[in-house]
Amino acid sequence: MLTKIGLYTGSFDPVTNGHLDIVKRASGLFDQIYVGIFDNPTKKSYFKLEVRKAMLTQALADFTNVIVVTSHERLAIDVAKELRVTHLIRGLRNATDFEYEENLEYFNHLLAPNIETVYLISRNKWQALSSSRVRELIHFQSSLEGLVPQSVIAQVEKMNEKT
């Protein structure tokens, strides 16, 4: 039987409970999942790549079939081919996400026609949540309780101690 291997990518700057919900749901659908932290060349990162990896790795520690990987200046589809991924995993919060993902899937299919894309619709409670909104809350030192994993809260508290 073919092993189903998924790749869920994002900048995870920082990881949110919405991201974790997608991973949790996907972990039951796939034999193995890679969660790929990618630097988005169109965005300036708030957290350094190694910090994002540490926060995400800690948040996903209980998942036995999930491996966190990082990539710098590479297309996710190229990493997917290298890892022998069978499916890309994408989360959809709203119609704007769908339009973006529809375009992305077109090009991914051109580059790797054998890799399918699976879309998981965000649960209602996470549809308004985004990393950019969390960064805004961090800037104004607002509570992150219930929005992000404890690893992110601990990192923010550590950063606040230094300032």
UniProtKB/Swiss-Prot annotation:
Residues reported to bind ATP: S11, F12, H19, G91, L92, R93, E101, W126, Q127, A128, L129, S130, S131, S132
Biological-process GO terms, alphabetical: coenzyme A biosynthetic process
Sites marked Transition state stabilizer: H19
UniProt keyword annotation of Nucleus present: no
Reactions that this protein is recorded to catalyse: (R)-4'-phosphopantetheine + ATP + H(+) = 3'-dephospho-CoA + diphosphate
Pathway: Cofactor biosynthesis; coenzyme A biosynthesis; CoA from (R)-pantothenate: step 4/5
UniProt xrefs under InterPro entries: Cyt_trans-like (IPR004821), PPAT (IPR001980), Rossmann-like_a/b/a_fold (IPR014729)
Protein location: Cytoplasm
An annotated Gene Ontology molecular function: ATP binding
Cofactor: Mg(2+)
Binding residues annotated for substrate, in chain numbering: S11, K43, A76, R90
EC number: 2.7.7.3
A family per Pfam: CTP_transf_like
Keywords, comma-separated and alphabetical: ATP-binding, Coenzyme A biosynthesis, Cytoplasm, Magnesium, Nucleotide-binding, Nucleotidyltransferase, Transferase
One CC-aspect GO term: cytoplasm
Subunit: Homohexamer.
UniProt similarity note: Belongs to the bacterial CoaD family.
Functional summary from the UniProt entry: Reversibly transfers an adenylyl group from ATP to 4'-phosphopantetheine, yielding dephospho-CoA (dPCoA) and pyrophosphate.
HAMAP family according to UniProt: PPAT_bact
Name the UniProt record assigns to this protein: Phosphopantetheine adenylyltransferase
